[in-house]
């Protein structure tokens, strides 16, 4: 069984975050929300967020800046920008700088939003399935599995 995809939404408007929560609560994602773009790096690192969806126009920081930071710290995280401000230049800049994978315009269409997130989910699950095991973890597992007892007998741990 695959683990649920973790999605973080950043928007300075609490009403938008509440609407997103209602729209997506039954989609099988583990959802996180914040109005503070300065919390994003901490949340992405602590919770191993798979997808970050950021509003563009926020008082403290733009969505492009938030998603560029996520890209720098966690390059494999899928990044999506969502905005009601059809700022074509910012969108082009974000795409050209590789900050975003998708752009969603507000007001969003619920079905389209769900489809975008499920498409990202499928891509993430394929990446997980194809991922090479972490070498450090493989060594730890190997050492737990094969041990030598005091008499020199090799003991294989069934775990």
Which residue ranges define each predicted feature?
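Receiver (REC) domain active-site loop signature in two-component systems and cognate sites
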Residues: 58
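CheY-like receiver
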Residues: 122-159
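Two-component/phosphorelay signaling modules centered on CheY-like receiver
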Residues: 2, 14-33
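Acidic, metal-coordinating helix/loop segments flanking the phosphotransfer/catalytic sites
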Residues: 33-51
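C-terminal output helix
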Residues: 107-117, 121
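Acidic catalytic/metal-coordinating carboxylates
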Residues: 5, 35-36, 62-65
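Short amphipathic alpha-helix used as the core "switch/output" element in two-component signaling
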Residues: 42, 64-78, 93
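Active-site residues of response regulator receiver
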Residues: 11, 55, 83
């Amino acid at each position: 069984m695959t683990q649920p995809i973790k999605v973080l939404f950043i928007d300075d408007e609490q009403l938008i975050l509440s609407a997103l929560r209602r729209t997506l609560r039954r989609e099988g994602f583990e959802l996180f929300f914040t109005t503070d773009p300065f919390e994003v790096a901490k949340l992405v690192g602590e919770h191993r967020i798979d997808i970050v969806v950021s509003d563009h126009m926020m008082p403290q920081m733009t969505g492009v800046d938030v998603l560029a930071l996520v890209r720098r710290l966690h390059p494999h995280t899928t990044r999506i920008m969502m905005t009601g401000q059809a700022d074509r230049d910012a969108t082009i800049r974000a795409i050209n700088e590789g900050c975003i994978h998708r752009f969603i315009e507000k007001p969003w269409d619920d079905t389209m939003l769900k489809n975008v997130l499920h498409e990202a989910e499928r891509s993430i699950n394929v990446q997980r399935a194809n991922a090479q095991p972490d070498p450090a973890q493989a060594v730890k597992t190997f050492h737990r599995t094969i041990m030598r007892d005091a008499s020199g007998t090799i003991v294989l741990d069934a775990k």
